[in-house]
Amino acid sequence: MVKVDKEELTVIRKFEHIEHCLKKQVEAHVSTQFENIHFVHTSLPEIDKDEIDLSVEVLGRKFDYPIMIAGMTGGTKGSQLAGKINKTLAKAAQELNIPMGVGSQRAMIRKPETWESYYVRDVAPDIFLVGNLGAPQFAENMPNRYGVEEALKAVETIQADALAIHMNPLQESVQPEGDTQYKGVITALAELKGELSYPIIAKETGAGVSMEVAIKLESIGIDAIDVGGLGGTSWSSVEYYRAKDEKSKNLALKFWDWGIPTALSVAEVRYATGLPIIATGGIRDGIMIAKALALGANLAGVALPLLKPAVNGDVEGVIKILQQYIDELRNVMFLVGAGSVKELKKVPIVVTGFAREWLEQRIDLWEFLRDRRL
């Protein structure tokens, strides 16, 4: 039997992740809860639709639209596929002037020859680019644990503008080869923030960020939170398809729908902190983007819907999807009388169903919703 080292296994795993996301049903069976967030229609918008301003400023950069292409891949076997995906997405981001993230750079740290699969500056010189490393790699009990050297390498090798630290305890816990060392991560991130001159974004990957975690992250100086909520791609489902034995399959299956729905995570983080929020996890149209922004997000991130055109190198296909979302967002803003994203955050919203039940137990919902008027 041929023994594969852990770094090579990481590269192979990245390819398997893309393959399953393209070919299998990998989304959560439960919703983002955006369906329980409602706008109040206004019959007299008192604005012109074509004059609505969709631009936002986040982390010191101005973007034409409040949308981010979320990190998906990098460092796959042979690197060509990941490189093709990232360059396609980057060209779209450049065209639309929106930010973009890359997938986990762990493969690049251990196998530097994969760096080109993450590099997009040749096709997107102006985009706000976010690098990506995993939280477990900074844990105190992790062999060869990461520090500022690896963080700088992740950012500077691809000429990124910020670094995302992805928190994925769910995926790691159901992955046979998963890294479940998380002790000391908060301390490590606090130290990293003290030494790294680039913005750090704490990023979940499908299970959501609670207000308790958000408060801890804000207290150590983290610059922004990507909530990565439940309702979109379930990485437990991806590990279900990867599993080689019944025990591993059963564990991943049980946790397929674990987490905090995206809409509720956005509300919790906004209620508890003043940090910029990126809403990812099941964002599938411009109406959901509008609801995320109204709940307090600064950007909404999209991943899975863009993967298929990106795999085919179809830049126009990626732009077409994003443009549809933009058109839908603009239409929502017109129908609620919001001439800007700042105004959208003030319009009345109504919370019903499970979302209301959850938020009434977790936050002061009345305080969160009151005084919302233009």
UniProtKB/Swiss-Prot annotation:
Positions that bind Mg(2+): E172
The EC designation for this entry is 5.3.3.2
Cofactors, names only: FMN; NADPH; Mg(2+)
Show the SUPFAM superfamilies listed in the entry: FMN-linked oxidoreductases
Q: Which reaction does it catalyse?
A: isopentenyl diphosphate = dimethylallyl diphosphate
What is the recorded name of this protein?
Isopentenyl-diphosphate delta-isomerase
Described by its record, this protein's role is as follows: Involved in the biosynthesis of isoprenoids. Catalyzes the 1,3-allylic rearrangement of the homoallylic substrate isopentenyl (IPP) to its allylic isomer, dimethylallyl diphosphate (DMAPP).
Query: One biological process GO term for this chain?
Result: isoprenoid biosynthetic process
**Which positions are annotated as binding FMN?**
G71, M72, T73, S104, N132, K203, T233, G282, I283, R284, A303, L304
* Organism encoding this protein: Thermococcus sibiricus (strain DSM 12597 / MM 739)
Its organism's taxonomic lineage begins at: Archaea, Methanobacteriati, Methanobacteriota, Thermococci, Thermococcales
Q: Which gene encodes it?
A: fni
| UniProt keyword Flavoprotein, yes or no | yes
What NCBIfam families does its record include? IPP_isom_2
